[in-house]
Amino acid sequence: MFEAPVPMPRLAPQPPIYFCPKAAGEFVLDGNINKPFWNNVPFTEDFVDISGGDFPTPRFRTRAKICWDERNLYIAALLEGNEIWATIKQRDSVMYYDNDFEVFIDPSGSTHNYMELEMNAFNTQWDLLLTMPYRNGGRSVTAWNMPGVETACMISGEVN
């Protein structure tokens, strides 16, 4: 019998599941997660490195709250840390070297032709379409703009 080693995938075959409740109440875009709108929306599990379990647990806690209504998807993130660093102020600039928050939206679940939105502490946005993951030879379409996106950022502390 022929046996070949099968490497363990770098990412868990089944990502964590988050129940995304329907929004209740009136939403105000101001970056403040401590408002009644968010009170009944549960936090996600703490975020981990996208590269998988072989990587260390992040030094600082990051988690999010997500809900929806007939018109919008609402995402609030709480990023903890004692240093808030941002340099990028021009839209659609590579910003993952800053402290940033990234959202990946893959409606088909195929990891192909998915949307990415990043924002930093200055509320600078980088939205792009990815043909497939970079590790699989994917290319980003930075000229693409995510329709209807609005963001806000609230900082507790000083930037830089």
What are the language-model segments listed below?
Residues 1-160:
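Structural preference for beta-rich elements and adjacent junctions enriched in aromatics
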